[in-house]
Amino acid sequence: MSTSTSTTHGTGTDAAAEFAGKTAFVTGAASGIGLEIARRLAAGGAAVVVADYNEQGAQDVARSLTESGARAAAVRVDVTDPESVRRAVEFTAETFGGLQLAVNNAGIAGTSAPTGAYTVEDWQRVIDTNLNGVFYSLRHELPHLLAAGGGAVVNMSSILGTNGFAGSAAYSAAKHAVVGLTKTAAVEYAARGIRVNAVAPGFIDTPLLKGDEAQHRQLVALHPQGRLGTAEEVAELTLFLLSDRASFVNGSYHLVDGGYAAR
């Protein structure tokens, strides 16, 4: 496993106090929603491990965070490989002396095809990343959260975690399952000081949705607010759920969808 580590102390501003003294592990943090979450956690005083399959991207983000005065490290992780996940989580705890916060965000969109034509290979690839990756992450994060005396986890689901969408059999199935996994883990660990919640973005303007202007217009039309969401808006809710401000919020599923699910 290749890693990149660099640390400096934060600036000590009021905003930096919320997560001071805590370590956060964020998957899929080299771009999009994960990148924005990592940035905001670092700005809030957390030591952040930027975990991503894109090793160079993770290193670039970690370097940017440390240059801004944060404590950060990068690690390559393949969330479809339980051993890779174990090593990445262990690296996090060893580098910063523990783990209190986790965001299981890594995911892929997969191919678009009707259920009857969806290939087994494409199905398995999406399930391995979007569902099994969350399970493997939780499985290795939870012992460290227990050792730390508690903590908070956010799993990234989707509006398709409670809705269907033509052509998205594997993606929707995985995101539905993430909600069930979130609720189960929350019930199991609530009495031991660990909160587990899920965030459900609508269609967000990230690199995953770039390149097809016609599709972009169609997706915008599905949201009553008349636009796609932003990574910043998803990160804002995620940080609230990780914070002590959400101390009695547990086992729940939180939409960030511009009214999509209310139609």
Regions found by a protein language model. Name each.
Residues 113-115, 119-127, 219:
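Substrate-binding pocket helix/loop in short-chain dehydrogenase/reductase
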Residues 2-15, 109-112, 163, 222, ...:
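Short C-terminal tail/terminal secondary-structure segment
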Residues 158:
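Residue(s) in the substrate-gating loop at a strand-loop-helix junction
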Residues 97, 150, 190, 195, ...:
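Short, small/polar-rich loop/turn modules that mediate ligand/substrate recognition or access, typified
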Residues 143, 187-191, 247:
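Alpha-helical segment proximal to the catalytic Tyr-Lys
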Residues 96, 138, 227-256, 260-262:
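C-terminal substrate-recognition "lid" of short-chain dehydrogenase/reductases
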